């Protein structure tokens, strides 16, 4: 069991109820003054809107749960998430098993690298948890159009642990990559259209960063765009790519880079299939390596098989 405060508990509860491996998610109030409060009193009693998450350790780890948690919060925002303000909307991780603290600390250390500001998420032993009123439980299931400050749909995207795919040193990268791969990933160059290795390949599998091996795209989201480069409607997870404004060649475009390796991948455009979200990730074949579905388990990517057709 772990207790997560991430702003309004309606969205946090609904998000975690959809995460594979979570057995139950219950809204409540935690770590305030005293063991009695309610929705009208929490701003006086100092409790945080918190979700009790019960999970199957054989299906999901605590670290994976915490990576999900950091996906849906702004960890640098004090007493504010989305449009909600007040100490009851602070972020926090409250544990009942001291052994969990080492994992929590590990995630904090990793996530601190992603932000310029200090992480202000509380981490503390659980003092008490008071179950919220019945009308708060499963609120968004009962009220599908109710207020929610997070994207619930992201719950179905896999969590990919960045620490498993560390970036090699500059020397190692130069030794590992071909001259063409190096020019594209490290010097932001673009390969030729219609003459690259994956533009017309649609076999089942995943595409990983040629530098780090971090998973980036799935064949399930690949489509024929006619542009001559591999095209995807989305990354395999929203966590694995970074975006940067690119004003080269007298154009304004959105560059796509890999998270762990910071490799230049390509650009994203808004002329993709409307029924798949409308985006087109135009990616250089030289920036990615294809892992066939049949090889994913043996190469350590078996946890992503459900993300592949």
Curated annotation (Swiss-Prot):
UniProt region (Peptide methionine sulfoxide reductase A), positions on chain: 1-153
Superkingdom of origin organism: Bacteria
Keyword match Oxidoreductase: yes
Annotated keywords: Multifunctional enzyme, Oxidoreductase
Active site: 8, 282 (nucleophile)
SUPFAM superfamilies in the record: Mss4-like, Peptide methionine sulfoxide reductase
Keyword Oxidoreductase: yes
Pfam families xref list: PMSR (PF01625), SelR (PF01641)
GO cellular component, one term: cytoplasm
GO molecular function annotations of the record: L-methionine:thioredoxin-disulfide S-oxidoreductase activity; peptide-methionine (R)-S-oxide reductase activity; peptide-methionine (S)-S-oxide reductase activity
Enzyme Commission designation: 1.8.4.11, 1.8.4.12
Record function comment: Has an important function as a repair enzyme for proteins that have been inactivated by oxidation. Catalyzes the reversible oxidation-reduction of methionine sulfoxide in proteins to methionine.
Family affiliation: In the N-terminal section; belongs to the MsrA Met sulfoxide reductase family. In the C-terminal section; belongs to the MsrB Met sulfoxide reductase family.
Stated name of the protein: Peptide methionine sulfoxide reductase MsrA/MsrB
């Amino acid at each position: 069991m772990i207790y997560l405060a991430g702003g309004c508990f309606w969205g946090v509860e609904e998000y975690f109820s959809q995460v594979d491996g979570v057995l139950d998610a219950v809204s409540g109030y935690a770590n305030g003054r005293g063991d009695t409060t309610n929705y009208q009193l929490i701003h006086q009693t100092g409790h945080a809107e918190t979700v009790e998450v019960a999970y199957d350790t054989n299906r999901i780890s605590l670290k994976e749960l915490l990576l999900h948690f950091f996906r849906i919060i702004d960890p640098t925002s004090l007493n504010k998430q989305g449009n909600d303000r007040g100490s009851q909307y602070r972020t926090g991780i409250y544990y009942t098993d001291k052994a969990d603290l080492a994992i929590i600390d590990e995630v904090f250390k990793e996530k601190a690298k992603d932000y310029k500001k200090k992480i202000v998420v509380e981490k503390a032993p659980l003092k008490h948890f008071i179950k919220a009123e019945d009308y708060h439980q499963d609120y968004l299931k009962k009220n599908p159009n109710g207020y929610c400050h997070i994207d619930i749909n992201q719950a179905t995207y896999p969590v990919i642990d960045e620490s498993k795919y560390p970036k090699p040193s500059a020397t190692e990268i130069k030794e590992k990559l071909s001259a063409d791969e190096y020019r594209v990933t490290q010097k932001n160059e673009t390969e030729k259209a219609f003459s690259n290795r994956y533009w017309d390949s649609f076999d089942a599998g995943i595409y990983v960063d040629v530098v780090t091996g971090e998973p980036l795209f799935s064949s399930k989201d690949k489509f024929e765009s006619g542009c001559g480069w591999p095209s995807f409607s989305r990354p395999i997870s929203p966590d694995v790519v970074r975006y940067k404004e690119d004003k080269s060649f007298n154009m304004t475009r959105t560059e796509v880079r890999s998270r762990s390796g910071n490799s230049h991948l390509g650009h994203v455009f808004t002329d993709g299939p409307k029924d798949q979200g409308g985006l087109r990730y135009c990616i250089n074949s030289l920036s990615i390596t294809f892992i066939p579905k049949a090889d994913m388990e043996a190469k350590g990517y078996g946890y992503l098989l459900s993300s592949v057709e």
